[in-house]
Each structure stands twice: as C-alpha cells, then as structure tokens.
C-alpha cells in the first residue's frame, strides 16, 4: 500500500491498482472529517458543515466546504441587503454608504469563492501548484467581510451586521485554516498534491526551492511577463536611473506606447483619469496602460475589481498628482474605505511616477490617499501624502519601492502582505496633542495567514513642519490594530522622533500581547533597543527575520519586478 495524504491527518490508502482500501463506512467519514477539521479555529462548525457529506475523500470534503462557505457568504450578502431595506428612511447617509460598501465587498468575496471552486475542479489532486494562490484568494474572502465591519462606526449597526455575517466569517476562517494545513504539509513533505496521487514523493530539495520556484534565473517572477517588465522599465525619464531620488524626479512616457493618454489641457484622449479607467477592458489578459501627463487632477479614482492589469504612469511624483479631500470626519456619507483618493479593487495594478494625495487635513480623521484591495500590486517611484490612514494596504500582496509616504495616525495600515523597500517615511504634524503611529497592521488570524507590513531599508524621519517639534510630539513605529498585528522593521534608519519604547498599545485593547513586532539591524538614534517595549522582539540574527524578506513574504510569485530598479530578494 502507498500512503497518500498530508500531515493534517487526512490519509487515504491506495493500492498499486489505484483502488481504495479499507471500509467505506460512516466511521471512515467521521475520521476524515475529524482529521480535516483538526486545524480549524472553530472545529465544531467545521464538523457540522461537513457532516452531511457522506464521503471520506479529502477532495470532495474540501470542495463541499468551499461550496458551503459560498452559500454562507451569499446569505450574508442577502442579509446586508435586507438590513438596508429594513432601515428605510431612518438610515443616514453614512449608514447607507457603509451598507452599500458591504454589499460590494461581499460580492467580491463571492466572485473569489466562485474562482476558487472553479480552479479546484473536481479533484483537489490536480490543484497542487495552485494551493498558495487559492489560499491567497481565501484570505481575501475573509478580509472583505472584515472590511465591512471595520467601516461601520455606528455601534448598533456594527453589532447587527457583525452577528448577521458571523457564520460566513467563521466558515471563511475555517477554510483558510484547512488550506494552510494542506500547504504547510506539502511544504514539509516537499511534495505537491498532484504528485502524491502518482507516488512521486521526490527528493529533498534545498530549503528555499519552494519559496523561489516561481523565479527565473535573474530572480524575477515567471508570472510577470517580459512585456510587463519592459513596460515598467520604459515608463520613466529616458536615460535616468530608476532609483533617481525617492519618489521624486522625472517620469514621462519614455519609449512606452500607452493605451490611453490623460491630459488636463486636452492634448490626450481624456481629460480625467476616471474616463481613461472606464475605457479599460474587463478581465483583460494584457495591460491597460494609462499615461497621465503632468498636472494636478482633483478627482476620486476607482479601478473596479473586474478591470484588472491596469498600469498607470506619470511625469513624476511631484508633477503628476491625483488629489482629493474626502474624509470620515468632514465628508457626510464617507467611510475609511470610501475616502480613498485612488481605490484599487482589481488584481495586477502597477503605478510609477505619480503622486497621490488626500488633502482633508488632520481634522478629517480617516482620509486615505491610496487604497489597494487587489492582489499583486506593484508601486515604484510614487509619493503618498495625507494625515490619518494615508496608505491603506488593505488586501492581497503588495510591493512598494522608492516611495515617499507621509502622515500622522496609522498612516500605513491594512490587512495585506506588504513590503515597502528603500523608501522615505515621513511623520507629519497633526492636531494639537495628536500622537503619530507609522503603522497599524490589521491581521485578525494567527499563523494561518501571511499578513503584515515589512519596512526594509527605509528611512523614518520628521517632515519639515514637524522637525522643530519632533521631540515633543510623540511618534511611534506602530500599534496593533487587530489581535495578530504583524510588523517588521529591518535595515532601516530611524530618526530621533521615534519614542524610545518604539511601539504603542491600541487604546483599550490588549492586542499587543498577541501581536508580532520585530526589529533587526536598524540604525539611527531612534533604533536604540534599550528602552523598547518588552513585547517587541529585537532579532539578533538574520535567520530570525528571513521570513520577512521579499522572496519569502510575497510568495508564491514573489513579485520582483525588473523595472530598472535593484530589488532585494533577501536581507
């Protein structure tokens, strides 16, 4: 007999002829369900979901779980619609806005679940190479539901909606746990699910093979086509080194031929960026390339979920500027997510040589300059200016290089796997008595998901307005927005504006007790570890932070872009 299975305990015995051994009894079904649900956060709910599925085949059980999760999210979507309808005329503008947003992101979750089920097919054994991507989509499904609740400010509505979508969140959470167990087991056994059925257990590879398997000989991702690499490389000032300045310098079309040109003076096809986005095709296998000529464009821009693979580039981060002033504090009917000047809902977004601003000011409270919900976002040589929640790295995998980002409260925040490399991070002067927090990660689940913010080889300083008061205005590296917040600061210059304790607690919560904060090989007066909070880890060796490198944190594709920029895969 050949043992075919994974370390979560779901083991099927198959003889050489491919026939199943053992009794096909209810007992075997119960054991399979018990083993599959062993990794779930809510084991009781997991078992209850799978009890009607009279099979001990892991593929059938997992697919049944996905379908049950999809059904639960559908019910959550319907519940949201009925809640909105029930509130009727009693509903204020903000409640309507947030419920509309909830309906939208729940539809995103449904679309991703449909994709997951389709990609899984009838036999999980054929999905081995896709497991990490399936898990990434599942993480998004969970995050979308979390987004809905996070955006609700009104306590009673928050309570009602929290209870209304509770079941679908539990199932989504359990689904992530199951896929995490599968991918972890495959990694430990160094075997793909589709290899297991054939008995091709293979030889033990070098430790990093699985992590780097999607990179080519130059250390660049195979998923990123030669055409895309050329686009990013050519979308800059001709003859200039791509690392010229940090978020500054020239841009321009270079040798690239854009699909659409935006110009305020009418010399392009469109005068607004939103018009150009509307002209991009949905579900595009290629690139929609939008060149935005120098100018200040005051508009809110949303890239819809179905309008994927959009690449925007401008004439420089201080020359091509997209700006708006929508905020939670000053704009009726606005939530954090809806305040974003630019909102990217789709996968495969790229940007270069553009400035993004939210000018609501410190009194606007949450006021996002740039929000990304889509997976595989790549941003080079851009600038992000705001106050609270400037850069909302909300979902998926995101890579930033040579950017400037400025703000006050939680100004780099979200629920994604994000690496910001070789960038300038500026704390600003907010309202009197206001405290600055550079990061606020929103990871809600434990080890099963790869979510967190990594600052690598950056500079954290005070901007010009804060400079004189930098020692009296309290500034911290971050605080935990959610229970399992994860942030790493590596090889970074930290100015003296940062408090000696380094990190702060979230007021009224004990998230710091379960959060993960790591520092390694930093420099500057603000990097002294002597007075750091006891719950932050001061790593002593590279091995302790290896998991936060680009090659490891942004798997499976690793997304290193050529783009005329030197990219560090490792430390």
UniProtKB/Swiss-Prot annotation:
Q: Which UniProt keywords apply?
A: Aspartyl esterase, Cell wall, Cell wall biogenesis/degradation, Hydrolase, Secreted
A GO term for molecular function: pectinesterase inhibitor activity
Which positions bind substrate?
A: 336, 366, 479, 481
User: InterPro entries, per this entry?
Assistant: Invertase/methylesterase_inhib, Pectin_lyas_fold, Pectin_lyase_fold/virulence, Pectinesterase_Asp_AS, Pectinesterase_cat, Pectinesterase_inhib_dom, Pectinesterase_Tyr_AS
Which Enzyme Commission number(s) are on file for it?
A: 3.1.1.11
- Which residues are the active-site ones? 389, 410
Q: Which reaction does it catalyse?
A: [(1->4)-alpha-D-galacturonosyl methyl ester](n) + n H2O = [(1->4)-alpha-D-galacturonosyl](n) + n methanol + n H(+)
Q: Where is this region: Disordered?
A: 233-254
Its BP terms in the Gene Ontology are:
cell wall modification; pectin catabolic process
Region span, Pectinesterase inhibitor: 27-178
Query: What SMART domains does the database record attribute to this sequence?
Result: PMEI
Is Nucleus among the key words of this record?
no
Q: Which domain of life is it from?
A: Eukaryota
Which locations, inside or outside the cell, does it occupy?
Secreted, Cell wall
Region called Pectinesterase, residue ranges: 259-558
Instruction: Pinpoint the site Transition state stabilizer.
Output: 388
| GO CC entries | extracellular region
**Which family does the similarity line name?**
In the N-terminal section; belongs to the PMEI family. In the C-terminal section; belongs to the pectinesterase family.
Q: What else is known?
A: The PMEI region may act as an autoinhibitory domain and prevent untimely PME activity during transport.
Q: What is this protein called?
A: Pectinesterase/pectinesterase inhibitor
* Species this chain originates from: Brassica campestris
